[in-house]
């Protein structure tokens, strides 16, 4: 690959409320009819190609005949007459190409219909669950073989990626191993969590049980190193980082801006640092408030509540342990300081650890806040006990690894929708050009596909493959799901917009820091939980 590689994401939709079963059956029948017609035109294309080959064979059946060999009627030899074989052959190939193009268009339309309306999603999820359970049982029975097998596939991916990129690139290891990640991780979780083989069929929370056991040791160890005193204070931004939002897509863009600004990936000169979240208050036409909380992911700083160790506590199957996670405590305290009322509607959006925090708040702070909608990007939240009244929109990439750390697929329910994206190479973007006469040709970011709905381009370029855990990949996945016209996505989008409907009145930023001391600066608040013996 080159120094400027471009990517696209093709999405599939699972869960949510689509059309009635009878309507889905009609769509399935239409998709099948389109696929059947595509197969028919493919057969015709093959027949035309065969005819062209037969004509060519007939031309060469008499090697001593100059006129027949040339296939040109103008090459007249007295006493000989020939058909225009060259022209006939070309016409056959033209017909074959046209029929194949029709076949591809029809098959593409069927595929778009299937993806937009999740026509076979139930069968896909059932097969995925069975495969995961088999891998889990195999991992528990023969953990050494499972580890060796995954390591071999990862090594093969590493070598293949080295060949493709021309340099060593570990990102390819996740690309090659993603079909096995959930099953092997759930198997490892079963071993650590002490779940017997076979008894896990009715459950999917093996990883969470294992995380709970690990957190009993990692939590106290983290407190010794980092401290357990959490200071939360409001900070001011010098730039408009998180702007007004009226949709999931706009909120994801704000999430990306805040996440990359605090990590130094972009420079908005806001002055915001790591461990920072945003809380926005929207005022509705009736004077009531609604709220949107934007929560970036792990930053890994030594005194940040969004460190690596907090992920383990957030993933625990134990509610008390989850509530002790510093990042969850930090967001809950910021929401309290912002003045969010118990009965005021709240939407949460988070990436990676931020999404796990959002799911934890929806699960474990349900009595304190009215959390109506949660949007997660690349977050392993399949086993969080989010109440039915809360809508969940999860966006994941199949090979990003992080979203698979829960060892299970997300629930497929009316209120829980998952957009799963698949990354593939895209054509290079074309820059804008200004011509000598002053006219301008705008640049374009093309995709590989027959229609604009086949995939959505990922913003920017890369130098080879990279982990698809960056928010820009989730943005492309959600864009493609939206472009498909999925009724389930449309309903979730409408619900999210309804929750935050109103005029943006304020955007406030809150920063969290972990300390060993209870001494706090003016305007700061501190919260502390004992992680020993509790």
Task: Please name every model-derived segment.
Residues 137-348, 361-370:
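Long, composition-driven intrinsically disordered regions
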Residues 296-329, 334, 340-341, 368-373, ...:
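Lipolytic serine-hydrolase domain surface
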Residues 25-32, 36, 209, 336-337, ...:
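Polar/charged alpha-helical tracts
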Residues 349-359:
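Gly/Ala-rich beta-loop-alpha elbow adjacent to hydrolase catalytic centers
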Residues 347-350, 374-376:
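Extended hydrophobic secondary-structure segments that form protein cores and membrane-embedded regions
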Residues 108-127, 187, 396-404, 431-437:
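A short, terminal or domain-edge coil/loop segment
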Residues 1-140, 531-534:
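N-terminal secretion-targeting helices of virulence/extracellular proteins
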């Amino acid at each position: 690959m080159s120094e400027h590689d471009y990517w696209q994401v093709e999405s599939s939709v699972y869960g949510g409320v689509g059309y009635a079963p009878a309507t889905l059956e009609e769509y399935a029948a239409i998709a099948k009819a389109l696929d059947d017609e595509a197969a028919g035109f493919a057969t015709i294309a093959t027949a035309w190609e065969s005819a062209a080959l037969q004509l060519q064979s007939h031309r060469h059946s008499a090697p001593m005949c100059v006129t027949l060999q040339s296939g040109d009627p103008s090459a007249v030899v007295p006493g000989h007459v020939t058909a225009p074989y060259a022209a006939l052959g070309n016409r056959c190939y033209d017909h074959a190409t046209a029929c194949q193009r029709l076949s591809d268009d029809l098959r593409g339309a069927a595929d778009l219909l299937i993806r937009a309306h999740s026509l076979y999603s139930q069968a896909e999820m059932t097969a995925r669950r069975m495969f995961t359970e088999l891998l889990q049982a195999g991992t528990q029975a023969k953990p050494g073989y499972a580890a060796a097998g995954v390591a071999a596939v990862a090594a093969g991916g590493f070598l293949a990626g080295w060949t493709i990129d021309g340099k060593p690139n570990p990102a390819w290891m996740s690309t090659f191993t993603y079909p096995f990640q959930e099953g092997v991780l759930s198997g490892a979780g079963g071993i650590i969590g002490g779940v017997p083989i076979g008894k896990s069929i009715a459950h999917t929370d093996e990883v969470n049980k294992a995380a709970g056991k690990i957190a009993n040791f990692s939590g106290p160890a983290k407190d010794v190193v980092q401290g357990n005193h959490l200071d939360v204070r409001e900070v001011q931004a010098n730039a408009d980082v998180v702007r007004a939002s009226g949709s999931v897509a706009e909120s994801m863009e704000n999430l990306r801006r805040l996440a990359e600004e605090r990590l130094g990936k972009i420079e908005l000169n806001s002055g915001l640092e790591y461990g920072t979240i945003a809380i926005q208050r929207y005022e509705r036409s009736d004077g009531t408030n609604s709220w949107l909380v934007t929560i970036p992911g792990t930053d890994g700083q030594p005194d940040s509540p969004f460190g690596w160790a907090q992920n383990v506590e957030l993933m625990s199957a134990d509610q008390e342990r989850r509530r002790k996670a510093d990042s969850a405590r930090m967001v809950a305290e910021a929401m309290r300081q912002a003045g969010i009322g118990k009965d005021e509607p709240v939407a949460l959006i988070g990436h990676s650890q931020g999404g796990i925090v959002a799911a934890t708040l929806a699960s474990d702070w349900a009595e304190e806040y009215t959390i109506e909608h949660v949007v997660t990007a690349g977050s392993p939240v399949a086993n969080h006990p989010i109440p039915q009244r809360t809508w969940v929109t999860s966006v994941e990439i199949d090979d990003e690894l992080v979203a698979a750390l829960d060892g299970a697929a997300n629930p497929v329910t009316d209120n829980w929708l998952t957009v799963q994206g698949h990354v593939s190479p895209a054509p290079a973007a074309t820059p804008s050009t200004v011509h000598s006469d002053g006219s301008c040709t705008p640049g374009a970011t093309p995709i590989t596909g027959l229609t604009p709905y086949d995939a959505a381009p990922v913003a920017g370029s890369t130098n080879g493959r990279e982990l698809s855990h960056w928010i820009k990949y989730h943005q492309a996945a959600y864009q493609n799901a939206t472009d498909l016209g999925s009724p389930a996505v449309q309903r979730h989008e409408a619900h999210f917009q309804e929750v935050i409907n109103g005029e943006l009145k304020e955007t406030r930023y809150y920063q969290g820091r972990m300390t060993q001391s209870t001494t706090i600066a003016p305007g700061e608040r501190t919260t502390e939980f004992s992680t020993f013996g509790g």
